[in-house]
Amino acid sequence: MSFKHYSQISKEDIPSMNIKNVNAFLRDFSISDDKEKPITSGLFRLKAGESLKYTYTYHEMKLIVDGSFTIEDETGQKVEAKPGDLFYFPKGTAVTFTTSDFGLGFFCGQRGEGEA
């Protein structure tokens, strides 16, 4: 079995998440063929404006690759996220993403395509 390669995904267009008043964008790039335990990876971008409030219905890892985010969960844990920071969001985590400029994250989640 051969591997798959996706060249320069950070230069690709990332469509809007279509959340009113929130400048959030997300694109799934690679999806596993495992129907029982799917894995999906891609890019998430947030631009300055309203915060994005999101509750994870799946487990996800997110690596900050550019810009910055303020990430706060329902327990009050708050981090000023910068490139190189890695996050694990367990299923059920309620989190708020905010940025004063923009942030870009690479994610890998235990979900199927388009299930974010």
Model region roles, listed by residue range:
Residues 91-115:
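Ligand-binding loop in jelly-roll beta-barrel domains
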Residues 46, 56-71:
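Short, conserved beta-strand element in jelly-roll/cupin
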Residues 75-91:
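Short acidic-glycine-tyrosine-enriched beta hairpin
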Residues 42-43, 52-56, 73, 79-80, ...:
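Short histidine-centered beta-strand/loop micro-motifs
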Residues 35-37, 46-51, 68, 113:
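Short, charged/polar surface micro-motifs in flexible loops or helix N-caps
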Residues 1-38:
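A short, N-terminal "cap"/entry segment at the start of jelly-roll beta-barrel domains
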Residues 27-30, 40-56, 90-91:
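Conserved short histidine dyad/triad with adjacent acidic residue
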Residues 41-43, 61, 86:
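Conserved hydrophobic/aromatic beta-strand scaffold that supports enzyme active sites
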